Curated annotation (Swiss-Prot):
Its EC number is 2.1.1.56. Belongs to the class I-like SAM-binding methyltransferase superfamily. mRNA cap 0 methyltransferase family. Gene3D superfamilies: Vaccinia Virus protein VP39. Keywords: Methyltransferase, mRNA capping, mRNA processing, Nucleus, RNA-binding, S-adenosyl-L-methionine, Transferase. One of its GO terms (molecular function) is RNA binding. It catalyses: a 5'-end (5'-triphosphoguanosine)-ribonucleoside in mRNA + S-adenosyl-L-methionine = a 5'-end (N(7)-methyl 5'-triphosphoguanosine)-ribonucleoside in mRNA + S-adenosyl-L-homocysteine. This is mRNA cap guanine-N(7) methyltransferase 2. Pfam families: mRNA_G-N7_MeTrfase. InterPro entries: mRNA_G-N7_MeTrfase_dom, RG7MT1, SAM-dependent_MTases_sf.
Length: 354
């Protein structure tokens, strides 16, 4: 029996996360594509990719995750070729370890581990450099990560409310965020948002264990991606992603479980709260032979401690004369670029770009 037979998750946040992955894969996947999943151990999205149908699947994970996946795969037959490699995308050098796979992937996805790579700048840089090595020119890197703009905004509001209460101690900050659906606890009480290593635990209601994460500082993500040769396309909260694509994905979300949307397909409060905790990110490796590469603005320089309230909007400007994307490549459904640096609440977005 396969170790990753697809079954409908029980918890609401698992079902919503699964819906988001399915929707994003439906947008990007195209026939005969070569797809690479980073940190595929545990539950690779094999059935979602098969519906495309893709032509080749490459799974990469550490030794603890890849062995069980490889064994389980032997009991299944897919309509596309499959390869697994044991490597850590945030530590190992793929130019050395995976020389034969350089510039082979049309798509590279990372669903749950981008935030873990932001423990240090070195690990985040290594991940993005490896992604750039794997992608063909014109290929896309995308996935889902907790929305650090939303998380930090909620935390700041909690701090503000704490200090507005009478009797609050000066220079003391609460270290948690609580909602009906989840609780986030930061390891350190601090007022600033460091670029790397801001650790927290996320525990959903109904779950026994918490998840360890690091906040992803979006300006640093964009900067490191550009240095690795990846151009920023979009970072968008999953609530905005759903609203932009409601006509296409409302029925898919209705099938994911009850009490997520109303009869018109509008998100209900609990689903809005859970989806709003996450964001999707998209980067592209430019193909100079097809069109001029997108211009990614360079985030302004800052100190190592940075309050995300200071983050300006970054607008991505494309060349209007550039040829249109080929919809046969599965990219015609991507909405026009938002140009926002961090998804987060609207009151954290600045009115003008730099």
């Amino acid at each position: 029996m396969s170790g990753f037979v697809v079954s409908k998750p029980e918890q609401s946040h698992h079902r919503l996360f699964d819906f988001a992955k399915t929707a994003i894969i439906n947008i990007f996947a195209h026939p005969y594509a070569t797809v690479c999943e980073l940190y595929c151990g545990g539950a690779p999205e094999t059935d979602k990719w098969e519906a495309a149908p893709i032509g080749h699947y490459i799974g990469i994970d550490t030794s603890s995750g890849i062995s069980s996946v490889r064994e389980a795969w032997e009991s299944q037959r897919k309509n596309y070729d499959v390869e697994f490699f044991e490597a850590d995308p945030s530590k190992d050098d793929f130019e050395i370890q995976l020389q034969k796979k350089l510039e082979q992937a049309d798509l590279v996805s990372c669903w749950r581990h981008l935030q873990l790579c932001f423990e240090t700048e070195e690990s985040a840089r290594r991940l993005l450099t490896n992604v750039a090595c794997l992608l063909k020119p014109g290929g896309y890197f995308f996935g889902i990560t907790p929305d650090s703009s939303t998380i930090w905004a909620k935390y700041q509001k909690n701090v503000e409310a704490y200090h507005n209460r009478s009797g609050a101690k000066p220079n003391v900050f609460p270290n948690y965020i609580r909602s009906e659906s989840y609780m986030i606890t930061f390891e350190l009480e601090e007022e600033k948002f460091p670029l790397f290593g801001k650790r927290y635990q996320l525990k959903f209601s109904g779950d026994n264990a918490s998840e360890d994460h690091c906040l992803v500082h979006f300006p640093s993500l964009i900067r490191l991606a550009r240095e690795a040769g990846l151009e920023f396309v979009e970072i968008q909260s999953l609530t905005d992603f759903y609203d932009d694509n409601r006509a296409q994905f409302a029925s898919l979300l209705m099938n994911a479980g009850p009490n997520f949307v109303d009869p018109r397909g509008k998100l209900l409060p609990r689903a809005f709260d859970l989806l709003g905790l996450y964001a999707t990110f998209i980067f592209q490796k430019p193909d100079p032979d097809i069109e001029p590469p997108l211009t990614t603005p360079i985030p302004f320089e800052s100190s190592n401690n940075h309050d995300e309230r200071e983050l300006p909007v970054i607008t991505v400007i494309t060349d209007a004369s550039a040829p249109a994307e080929d919809p046969s490549q599965g990219l015609g459904k991507i909405v026009e670029q938002k140009g926002i640096l961090g998804p987060g609440p609207a009151d954290l977005r600045f009115s003008e770009a730099i």
